[in-house]
Every structure is written in structure tokens, then in C-alpha cells.
Amino acid sequence: MKTYIVGGAVRDELLGVAVKDRDYVVVGATPEAMVAQGYTPVGKDFPVFLHPKTHAEYALARTERKTAPGYKGFVFHTDASVTLEEDLIRRDLTINAMAQDEDGSIVDPFGGKRDLELRIFRHVSPAFAEDPVRILRIARFAARFPEFTVAAETNTLMQDMVTAGEVDALVPERVWQELARGLMEVRPSRMFEVLRDCGALQRILPELDVLWGVPQPAQYHPEIDTGVHIMLVIDYAAGIKADLPVRCAALLHDLGKGVTLPDQWPRHHGHEMHSVKLVDTVSKRLKIPNDCRDLALMTAREHGNVGRALELRANTIVNLLERCDAFRKPQRFIEMLQASECDHRGRTGFADKPFPQKAYLQAALAAAQTVNGGEIAELTRQRYPDQAQRIPEAIHEARVQAVAAALKKQPGDPKE
């Protein structure tokens, strides 16, 4: 019985990256032998055990065989005769198929260390093609390690997997899980570049895939291409370490530009409402969590209004605040402003340009929040006892007055 550290922990240590979790594989053992040494069995699909002291997970070395389409269509085999190399060969990439012995030496049967030095993602064996999740994993790794490239033969294999329909067998929850993890990496644009290169993006997120090649007005978007713009936006969001809902909104806010008819290019009048419909469609299909969906919907609908904030009247600004439910959910409104800022700065040459609209609308919200709705409601009831509809009107008007007064000190000076 021999124990090895395997996978990402070995890779990250060789890269000089902080190791967060360690995976262990045990060679030459049986479930009975593990239990006899005090390990607690916890695995459902294959034998995994908790260490009696550290509670770290230890898996018995295993092989696997493809039995059905998709990432769940596998049968696992494990016994004391399975070797370390047999366990490692089932892994996705050479850089993830290394092991570390108890004495610290590296076991590298597939050239993972060399591929680390070359900064290449290369599949271990043709069995890579049996699990479509591996396409998403490579794309996610590209977002984490943006200096890496996909080996030509691996990209060809991924293209073949897409053509064979393997990607279509992925369950929506798993697609979103991997996309969300990739969005939270250091350069999420690399994830989508890899997915586009192999054709997978067209299958899992066609609403985004069509944005490449769709032009925008050069005076506002020097990068011109809408797909390029979205990549700049999500990378800016990553650079400011935005939370996942903001990054999701940054990714999806301009989907409507993909349905603008070519004879209307490069203008995209009314794209906001098209974006709202498409965000809703994508959210339902991928089962995107409510917090991400709601912020993406709001950003798709309102990012143009945020961009024009300095030109808006106080009444229009209060309408915006009320439409966004900013008084009940102010933090979500602030996140929408942050996503809109990412949209503004995610343009070639705009990363360091001022975006006063964010502070302007935050000041408007703060001013409107000073209005005592309960007090106004009571006064209105006393004055108009049989006209309840006047209460929201009175509160709205008080907010308009408060916003107009507060923003006179801000650039833009909205009118009442």
C-alpha cells in the first residue's frame, strides 16, 4: 500500500502557486485494508476514504470505462492491482497527470512537467474525448493560466468531440458551474477564446458566440467588434475582483446586439430589450442562479440609461431608482452600476477614463433615501383620506425634489 499526492496540487507546487487542496490516491490497497487502518468510507461512485486524523480524502487507484454519452457515462474499476500509471492515464491533461511520492519525488509518466515549462495544455490519451466536461475544464484552466495555450492536437480532438455531439450531452447545471468558475478566474476572456476555437461556444452559448463579427460605432467602441468588447468587459470585471453576479452581468448585458439586422449596423437601437429577452432565455436554459440572473437582466435593461445619467432629469433618475427597486435592494443597484462601469471601461483605450455616472447615481440614491416615506404617507392620508393613490405619487415627488437639490452640486445639474 502506497500513498501519492496527485493532480492539481502537484501542478501548482511546480508552478509556485499556493496549493489550496491536496488529492491523495492509494495504490495497492483494498477497501477492507483502508477500514482496518481507521479510514472512514465516504465515496458513493468509487472508494473514497477520510483519513482518521486529518479527515483528508484518499481515493483508491482506479480505472474507468466509457459506457454512455455525457460526463456521467462511466464505469469505474478499482482493486489492489491497479497501478499508479493506470490511475494517472485516465486524467485529462498531462499537467494534471503527475503524482508526488511520500519522499517528495515526482512521478511523471506523460510529460506533464515539460508541458508546464512549455505552458501547454495537452491531453493525456484519446480517452480525453470520452468526457465533454474536459472541454469546459481546459477552457477554465485557460482563464486561470492565461499564458498557456492548447496543443494543436488537443484542440483538434476537442473539435471532433463537438462535432460528435458530446458537448450536447452536458447537463445545463454543469455548464453553468464551469462557466461561473471560469468567470471568477484572472482572465475569463481566455475561457471563451478556447471554447470558440473548438466550436463549443456555439453549442453551449450561441447567443454569445454570434457577437463576434458584429460591429459597433467606432467613435464609442474603438474595438468595434462586439465580441471583443464583451471580452474586454469581463476582463475588466475580473481586474477589479468583482463578485460573480457582476461578472455574469458583464458577460450577458449586450446579447441583444447579436440579433440586430445587418442593415442597421453599426447602430443597435433597441438592443437593450432584445438583451433582456435573451438573458432570460439563457438563464432558464443554463439554470443560472437568481442573483446572477436578476442583475444581468437589470444591467441589460438599464446600462444605456446609466451611461446617459448626467443628461437625465431628476424625475427620470427617480424613475430609474424605483424601476430597479433600489430602495429595497440598494446593494443590487450598486452592483448594476459596477457592471455598467465595466461596460464603459471595457473598450479599447477606456480602462482609465472617468466614469462619473456611477458616483452621480449613487449620490442620487443617497438623496432619495433621505425621504421619509412613512411620514409622507401619513400626511397624505390626512390631507386626502379617500385618495390612497396619492401616497406613492407624493413619495415619488419628494424623492424627485431631494434628488434635484442634491445633484445641483454634481456635474450634470438635473432639472426637476
UniProtKB/Swiss-Prot annotation:
PROSITE patterns registered for this protein in UniProt: HD
Keyword annotations: ATP-binding, Hydrolase, Magnesium, Metal-binding, Multifunctional enzyme, Nickel, Nucleotide-binding, Nucleotidyltransferase, RNA repair, RNA-binding, Transferase, tRNA processing
Residues reported to bind Mg(2+): D21, D23
Disulfide partners: none
GO molecular function: ATP binding; CCA tRNA nucleotidyltransferase activity; cyclic-nucleotide phosphodiesterase activity; magnesium ion binding; phosphatase activity; tRNA binding
EC code: 2.7.7.72, 3.1.3.-, 3.1.4.-
CC cofactor: Mg(2+); Ni(2+)
Transmembrane segments: none
Residue numbers binding ATP: G8, R11, R91, R137, R140
Ranges of residues in domain HD: 226-327
CDD domains: HDc, NT_ClassII-CCAase
Reactions mediated catalytically: a tRNA precursor + 2 CTP + ATP = a tRNA with a 3' CCA end + 3 diphosphate; a tRNA with a 3' CCA end + 2 CTP + ATP = a tRNA with a 3' CCACCA end + 3 diphosphate
Residues engaged in binding CTP: G8, R11, R91, R137, R140
Classification via InterPro entries: CCA_bact, HD/PDEase_dom, HD_domain, NT_sf, PolA_pol_head_dom, PolyA_RNA-bd, tRNA_CCA-adding_enzyme
Cofactor note: Magnesium is required for nucleotidyltransferase activity. Nickel for phosphatase activity.
Single GO biological process annotation from the record: tRNA 3'-terminal CCA addition
Pfam families: HD, PolyA_pol, PolyA_pol_RNAbd
Quaternary structure and partners: Monomer. Can also form homodimers and oligomers.
Family: Belongs to the tRNA nucleotidyltransferase/poly(A) polymerase family. Bacterial CCA-adding enzyme type 1 subfamily.
Record's function text: Catalyzes the addition and repair of the essential 3'-terminal CCA sequence in tRNAs without using a nucleic acid template. Adds these three nucleotides in the order of C, C, and A to the tRNA nucleotide-73, using CTP and ATP as substrates and producing inorganic pyrophosphate. tRNA 3'-terminal CCA addition is required both for tRNA processing and repair. Also involved in tRNA surveillance by mediating tandem CCA addition to generate a CCACCA at the 3' terminus of unstable tRNAs. While stable tRNAs receive only 3'-terminal CCA, unstable tRNAs are marked with CCACCA and rapidly degraded.
UniProt comment concerning the protein's domains: Comprises two domains: an N-terminal domain containing the nucleotidyltransferase activity and a C-terminal HD domain associated with both phosphodiesterase and phosphatase activities.
Other known facts: A single active site specifically recognizes both ATP and CTP and is responsible for their addition.
Protein name according to UniProt: Multifunctional CCA protein
Gene source species: Janthinobacterium sp. (strain Marseille) (Minibacterium massiliensis)
Gene name of the record: cca
